[in-house]
Amino acid sequence: MKFAVSSKGDQVSDTLKSKIQAYLLDFDMELDENEPEIVISVGGDGTLLYAFHRYSDRLDKTAFVGVHTGHLGFYADWVPHEIEKLVLAIAKTPYHTVEYPLLEVIVTYHENEREERYLALNECTIKSIEGSLVADVEIKGQLFETFRGDGLCLSTPSGSTAYNKALGGAIIHPSIRAIQLAEMASINNRVFRTVGSPLLLPSHHDCMIKPRNEVDFQVTIDHLTLLHKDVKSIRCQVASEKVRFARFRPFPFWKRVQDSFIGKGE
């Protein structure tokens, strides 16, 4: 089996990366950073996001597994003292994969109707470069509202525990193929009105965001911050691709949520 290891870059993570590589090579596995079948992410959720984007062009051929070396990583199943157990599992145990939905973001520009396509594992946020964001929000081709406020966040089910949660959005189980639209500090008064609640859009619905005046946007795709100029529209929907995580032992989604936000309790 071909593998690659991605590290956060700190001393602890780099040391673990070297150990994991050495152990797996001892089991006659092949280190291949271009076309790995499994990618071990050592660090936190940011490290896994980096690995996801690096291999986003081969998601149907690559599975991910996380080892967290700092605070609890939401995407990580393993801790540093378990790496020998993890290596044995990778080398000796047939694993199954779980698939999570992704967010597709298509930015269309006025010039020649040019398009750029992105995939997000967690979320996409859209903000104006200066002042409030003013944009029409269309759902499934129909005008839903004109938004005025700080910005908009569109998240995946697995990303619903990240920025979306801080905005008051719901936590969605990743077995549900949907995206969530949450508002950032919307302006609501007698003149301007928005729905004021997060919206859950199924896989056959898309969300189109069209600027009313400002055409330069700051768009984030997970950990990436991008400046887009002369934007005509931004379309978001559930992607056809899915991310695959290698599972060597049960770790239910709601258990992850409990451990991350509530703790184990007494």
UniProtKB/Swiss-Prot annotation:
Pfam families given in the database record: NAD_kinase, NAD_kinase_C
Cofactor note: Divalent metal ions. Both Ca(2+) and Mn(2+) ions are more effective activators than zinc, cobalt, copper and magnesium ions at low concentrations.
Cofactor: Ca(2+); Mn(2+)
Binding site for ATP: 150
Subcellular location: Cytoplasm
pH-dependent activity: Optimum pH is 9.
Regulation of this protein's activity per its record: Allosterically inhibited by NADP and activated by quinolinic acid. Strongly inhibited by HgCl(2).
Keywords in alphabetical order: ATP-binding, Cytoplasm, Kinase, NAD, NADP, Nucleotide-binding, Transferase
Residue ranges that the Swiss-Prot or TrEMBL entry lists as coiled coil: none
Domain of life: Bacteria
Catalytic activity: NAD(+) + ATP = ADP + NADP(+) + H(+)
GO molecular function: ATP binding; metal ion binding; NAD binding; NAD+ kinase activity
GO CC aspect terms: cytoplasm
Binding positions (NAD(+)): 45-46, 122-123, 148, 158, 161-166
EC number assigned by the record: 2.7.1.23
NCBIfam families: PRK04885.1
Job description of the protein: Involved in the regulation of the intracellular balance of NAD and NADP, and is a key enzyme in the biosynthesis of NADP. Catalyzes specifically the phosphorylation on 2'-hydroxyl of the adenosine moiety of NAD to yield NADP. It can use ATP and other nucleoside triphosphates (GTP, UTP) as well as inorganic polyphosphate (poly(P)) as a source of phosphorus.
Similarity comment: family membership: Belongs to the NAD kinase family.
Subunit structure of this chain's protein: Homodimer.
Protein name according to UniProt: NAD kinase 1
Natural source organism: Bacillus subtilis (strain 168)
Lineage of source species: Bacteria, Bacillati, Bacillota, Bacilli, Bacillales
